[in-house]
Amino acid sequence: MNEQIKNYFENLRINSENDATKLSRGTLEAYWTYEFNLNHNSSEFECNELPWTTDMSDFVKTMREAGVETIAVTETSTALLENLHKLAAQGCSIEGLCTIIRPDIWGNAKESPAIRIRLN
């Protein structure tokens, strides 16, 4: 994760610190994805949970504004296929399958299967 992305999300946090209702649900989901990556040190910008389909537009818009070019989706919910279609409807494209690496709770490298999405 580069400094542009960190600065964007940190500014988002600071600007909404006293009133999270200023942010849309999709923007909050994007911020929580950023937080997940800070806490898990994934090898790629990992998205372990996509937003509700109704919030996908704001989620993608926020990620693009932050400078995120690709996400590695590790979500395994039953809504995954529908979410992939919603991402495609936002102009995103599936680059293919990938494997992300992040430390487990003991600090050992753990591989997780993912789908790499280009946010275009």
Predicted region positions:
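Functionally constrained cores in energy, signaling, and assembly domains
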Residues: 34, 88, 113
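C-terminal edge-of-domain segments
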Residues: 91-120
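N-terminal leader/targeting segments
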Residues: 1-82
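A generic structural signal for short, non-catalytic loop/turn and secondary-structure boundary residues
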Residues: 66, 87, 108-110
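Short, aromatic/basic amphipathic alpha-helical patches
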Residues: 80-93
